[in-house]
A protein has these predicted regions:
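Cys/His-enriched microdomains
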Residues: 341-344, 411-414, 440-443, 448
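Short linker/helix segments within small regulatory modules
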Residues: 334-338, 427-440
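Short, non-ligating residues that shape and space the ligands of small metal-coordination modules
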Residues: 352, 422-426, 451-452
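Short secondary-structure boundary segments
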Residues: 218, 271-272
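Short metal-binding segments enriched for Cys and/or His
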Residues: 443-459
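ATP-dependent adenylation/nucleotidyltransferase module used to activate substrates
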Residues: 2-255, 260-262, 413, 425
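ATP/NTP-dependent adenylation/nucleotidyl-transfer catalytic domains that generate, transfer
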Residues: 2-14, 41-47, 241, 253-268, ...
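Cys/His-rich microdomains that often coordinate metals
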Residues: 350, 420, 437, 446-449
Length: 463
């Protein structure tokens, strides 16, 4: 990564903060949140962009330290269990941006209009340019195909603008005539614009109309573009055009789950202070209903936050205590169901997920919705209906076989059996119980390992 080499001191300082203990990070987050709130260019005019568990935790954390600002979300994109929490906390629901029919886009409409969000936001954007050639994007398309930039890019070669050869083989077909290649052309549109129309533009429009600036539950530990932006700009970024705060920038997944448990306690003590929004007055002010008590702030889609047994030798425990002033080590926190959530129709990075991937899990929780998303989103020129199933087939991701199918048990390695056993009850066919593991490809992680046949019988392990 060249960006970290060009900014070594910033990155070094940020990483040092990420390595601090939880107490330091929590106090640091509070300090940075207040600094943003009190900045003269912000002057307390803030809101919280709320989505899943991370930002729900942020909303409650800010309230717990005395920062009482509104929360907003395009809740219709979230799982129903997340919508339930949003409603009880008084999160303001925003609508997606308007589409061609002069009404808010639906999730299906944005895919039909623009294309499937697949691989990654960056790659999808490049594929979309190849699928929609114009004189204006000719230079960028050339860089995507060859890695060569024009005058604006300094006439460089072998730049990161070039799409990987693997995906050029699949999506570079529209440029075959120009470059004398024989790449494939995808039988579906690809786009990186779903997030923009469904989430980003509604939030930007709200920020502009309300003149408020966002707190966001972003963490550098999530990697990708977020990591780069947060490491270079820090928790608070204030410029002429952009003002935003990410108090959890230095948090890890363990930190956010630890804080979520603390915010659970805070909520249960203060739940009557949160009222659902029921409508608006003629002057635009909000109407509120009676408080709704939640049994937990953790949406059902995540399951519960639990701590796994400690897996350390005595020597490792002693070393840990020596490094942490005698503190006892604890097992890792995790959620028993989904670890991350997002739009049910989003396919970004699904190609690198272990199975069961997000669409597999949707099949278990909402079979009707799964059927629709996999098979009935778009129609091709022959009138045939298709959905994510066609896209996943094209990029080599399985989706039709089912972990719960006891007539077709899956070949799984020992590590994946142990991991899946935390979420499902795993069983072996009677004839496979006495068989020795054989070398093969693991259905879940895709690695060459010693594997045995297993299938799932319940969505949670039997107790």
């Amino acid at each position: 990564m060249k960006w970290d080499q060009n900014n070594p001191e910033k990155v070094k300082d940020f990483i040092a903060k990420m390595k601090q203990d939880y107490a330091f990070k929590k106090a640091y987050a509070a300090r940075r949140a207040w600094e943003f709130y009190n900045h003269p260019d912000v002057a307390g005019m803030c809101y919280v962009a709320v989505g899943g568990l991370d930002s729900i935790t942020l909303f409650l954390f800010l309230r717990s330290i005395g920062i009482e600002v509104p929360g907003t979300s395009v809740s219709m994109l979230e799982d129903r269990s997340i919508q339930k929490v949003h409603k009880a906390l008084g999160i303001r629901a925003l609508r997606p941006a308007n589409g061609p029919k002069d009404r808010p886009y639906t999730k299906i409409e944005v895919i039909r209009e623009h294309g499937f969000p697949v691989l990654s936001k960056e790659i999808a954007g490049k594929i979309s340019l190849l699928q929609h050639p114009s004189e204006k994007n000719a230079t960028v398309r050339h860089a995507i195909m060859t890695g060569e930039t024009g005058a604006y890019g300094g006439y460089r070669k072998n730049t990161r603008m070039k799409m990987s050869q693997k995906w050029l083989e699949k999506f570079g077909g529209p440029e075959n005539e120009k470059y004398g290649t024989n790449y494939q052309t995808a039988p579906f549109k690809v786009s990186d614009l779903c997030c923009y129309y469904l989430k980003e533009k509604p939030c930007n429009d709200y920020a502009r109309s309300s003149r408020r600036f966002p707190y966001m539950g972003l963490m550098a530990s999530e990697g990708g573009r977020r990591q780069k932006a947060l490491m270079l700009n820090g928790c608070n970024y204030i410029s002429k055009d952009t003002k935003r705060s990410a108090p959890f920038a230095i948090f890890t997944r363990q930190d956010i789950l630890t804080l979520a448990l603390e915010m659970e306690e805070y909520y249960q003590e203060h739940w009557q202070e949160f009222k659902p929004i029921t409508g608006e007055n003629e002057d635009g002010s909000l109407l509120y209903g009676d408080p709704i008590h939640l049994e937990t702030i953790v949406p059902e889609i995540y399951g519960e936050i639990v701590r796994d047994p400690l897996e350390m030798t005595e020597q490792e425990i002693d070393a840990y205590k020596a490094e942490h002033n005698g503190a006892e080590p604890e097992g890792q926190l995790r959620t028993t169901k989904a670890q991350r959530t997002g739009c049910s129709m989003c396919g970004f990075v699904v190609h690198i997920e272990s199975r069961p991937h997000r669409f597999d899990r949707l099949r278990y929780t909402s079979p009707g919705e799964w059927e629709m998303w996999m098979k009935h989103i778009c129609q091709d020129e022959n009138g045939e209906w298709y959905g994510w199933g066609r896209v996943l087939d094209y990029i080599g991701v399985g989706w039709e076989d089912d972990l719960f199918d006891d007539t077709a048990p899956k070949q799984l390695c020992e590590d994946c059996v142990a991991r899946l056993g935390k979420d499902f009850t795993m069983e072996q066919p009677a004839e496979a119980c006495n068989e020795k593991p054989e070398k093969g490809t693991c259905w879940s992680c895709g690695r060459k390992r010693c594997v045995s046949k297993y299938y799932a019988t319940e969505e949670e392990p039997a107790k």
